Amino acid sequence: MPAETGHFDHMTAGFVGIPFAVVVFAGHFSAMIVLLGLAVGLFVGLTSIGGGSVLTPMLILLLRIPTMVAVATSVVFCFITKGIASYQHMRQRTVDRASAISLLWGSLPAAVAGWLTLLMFRKIDILHGNVWVNREIGFALVGLGACILARDNKWISRLRAVENQNSAVVRLKLIIIGALVGFMFSTTSIGSGSVLVILLGVFAPLDENHVVGTSVFYGFVISAFVSVLQFTSGNTDWHLLGSLLLGAIPGVVIGSKLAVRAPKKFLRVCFSCAAISAGWKMV
């Protein structure tokens, strides 16, 4: 047991070291952005709601970061912050690898298609491209808010109860879900967390722990893949990313420890209302 704990500590230290390395490379950081990262990290730790859906609209609406830069930076942010959680779920054996693989079969080509779409907008007309992505983010936030509000409703469990559990049918549905989420995540940095949890809860024959674990692992893999794509397009703001991570990683750790006492349902409702409001402004 001590060996495992020590290994986890080394692994965690490696992820924590990433933002410091980024900041050293970038040359400076902003205290305000570090505090923003801390707030996002705390919320993610308290509620398990994905970082992209919280961070991206804040970057666009509050900091006035260009849309495509905000999306690319949020994608890399998700990759790093979900790495620690993904490793922990793997240790706890709460990742259903078959479901994750089916999701990725649909997601990887769809993510490439989304990245090519952003690249096309950037080369042809970046102004209209930002407007298009803004609207997509707006619709995604409204949909996400509605999904989270519906999360505790009884119709979800009734819908799942009548689902055909044939493995081939479930696999096909997961591939389709993966394609939809992969394209949305690649173009908006939203969807790999809360939206996927809702969809897996309805369409996948998994218990709640495996739904969360599989979603986190999937989010880590797809964000790693999209991060590589975004790196080649040069949209990531490394100064911004390093400052955000300096606050976010300790925020996630603190939020996770406080999560047991947190009023999760109340926080989800507050986030849903904020997401719908922010999304409406961006449509």
Segments predicted by a language model, with ranges:
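Transmembrane alpha-helix interface/packing and boundary motifs in multi-pass membrane proteins
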Residues: 37-48, 179-189, 222
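Transmembrane helix boundary and interhelical junction motifs in multipass membrane proteins
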Residues: 48-55, 189-197
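Juxtamembrane transmembrane-helix boundary motif
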Residues: 1-36, 61, 67, 90-181, ...
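Transmembrane helix-bundle signature of multi-pass membrane transporters/permeases
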Residues: 71-79, 104-108, 215-220, 249, ...
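Alpha-helical transmembrane segments of multipass membrane proteins
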Residues: 41-42, 58, 62, 86-87, ...
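Interfacial segments of multi-pass membrane proteins
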Residues: 55-69, 195-210
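Juxtamembrane transmembrane-helix termini in multi-pass membrane transport proteins
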Residues: 50-100
